Regions:
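Glycine-rich, flexible loop segments associated with nucleotide phosphate handling
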Residues: 134-141, 304-309, 326-329
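Preferential activation on post-signal-peptide N-terminal prodomains/segments
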Residues: 3-224
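C-terminal soluble interaction/assembly domains
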Residues: 322-335
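Segments that shape or occlude catalytic/ligand-binding pockets
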Residues: 148, 152-234, 239-323
Length: 335
């Protein structure tokens, strides 16, 4: 957005940290404003793709995640316009799949873990809270496990936020949750997950979730919105190391130039106009406005993408008739 008239921009040296106000009877603001430290003078970074994508680094990634000599098969698969490099690893029955902007590595053990964690609180089967009573497991403190994971991400050149969610996956809880998941699948007549049945302390692990960043800007993958988890990086770590590493939507960025940025107050005006045009009795509560780098167009043929700075607005929509059915909505404005 640098093409708007300059008087639209607030030339203040600092944006506020947040705001609490009522714009209208239906639009309430109790919001935190998030933006990088270096965005103080009403300017923000405009970025472009730089350096090596995950696809370019496939050999390094394979060496980092798989011990030498263990790759039993490797091939390239085309899916539509996207190419995937696939490595099969016999030793722990793992696969590693790499495209331009995604990396998915998982062992057999990881699939058992994934079968017993339901981390989306929108759904009835949510059980993430069960894994958050403890901080540490006997095999290693959580902090140390995250430090080890961070070192691997650093070697991959992937920057992530310190804003990390950790599920402490303790074997006795996983055993119980597996029984429930199987019972639920039988009841609903859906595919029954392969059961591990025997869970021991060797299965204890940490399940970390976070998101990619660039110089403190969250970097948002192209597909976002309802039902999409903003955490595009997840890692399962146990006493044998990384059992699963998933990065969905990673783009190596560099600074293109500094651009004037619309203030959070201007964004609130835009939100007021946006919701003012919707005919509804819902109540909108603006909770957070964050300055992000958003991937808007991906060109798989050229292994490239377009990036632009955006304000992401997180709004709680409360239904006036049934307050229980409130939901979060994310709305994006050009910065």
């Amino acid at each position: 957005g640098g093409c708007g008239k300059s008087q639209q921009y607030q030339k203040s040296t600092d944006f506020p940290k947040g705001m609490k106000t009522e714009l209208t009877e239906q639009i309430k603001v109790n919001a935190e404003f998030q933006y990088p430290e270096n965005c103080k003078n009403g300017k923000c970074a405009e970025t472009q793709i730089s350096g090596q994508t995950l696809w370019d680094k496939q050999e390094e990634i394979a060496q980092l995640l798989v011990q030498d000599g263990n790759i039993t098969n490797e091939y390239i698969d085309d899916y539509g316009t996207v190419q995937y490099k696939i490595y099969e690893i016999a030793e722990n029955n793992a696969t590693l799949v790499i495209s331009d902007d995604t990396l998915n590595y998982a062992t057999d053990q990881a699939s058992y873990i994934n079968n017993v964690l339901f981390s989306d609180s929108h759904f009835d089967d949510y059980n993430g809270n069960k894994y958050q009573d403890k901080t540490d497991l006997p095999f290693m403190p959580q902090k140390e496990a995250w430090k080890n994971v961070s070192e691997v991400l650093d070697k991959l050149g992937v920057d992530v936020s310190d804003d990390v969610i950790c599920y402490v996956m303790e074997h006795s809880i996983m055993c119980e949750e597996e029984k429930k998941a199987i019972a639920r699948a039988e009841e609903e007549d859906t595919k029954i997950p392969t059961a591990k049945t025997q869970w021991t302390e060797d299965d204890d692990c940490y399940y970390f979730m976070t998101y990619t960043t660039w110089q403190d800007y969250p970097v948002l993958p192209p597909v976002m919105g309802e039902g999409f988890d903003e955490n595009n990086v997840s890692v399962i770590y146990d006493k044998n190391g990384i059992q699963s590493l998933s990065i969905n939507g990673y783009y190596p960025l560099e600074l293109k130039n500094e651009v004037e940025v619309v203030s959070p107050e201007m964004v609130l005006k835009a939100l007021e106009k946006y919701f003012g045009n919707i005919i509804s009795d819902d109540i909108y509560e603006v909770q957070r406005i964050s300055l992000c780098q958003k991937v808007v167009q991906v060109n798989p043929d050229k292994h490239s993408a377009e990036i632009e700075p955006v304000w992401e607005c997180r709004v709680l929509v409360k239904n006036s008739d049934s307050p229980d059915s409130s939901y979060l909505q994310k709305i994006y404005f050009h910065a």
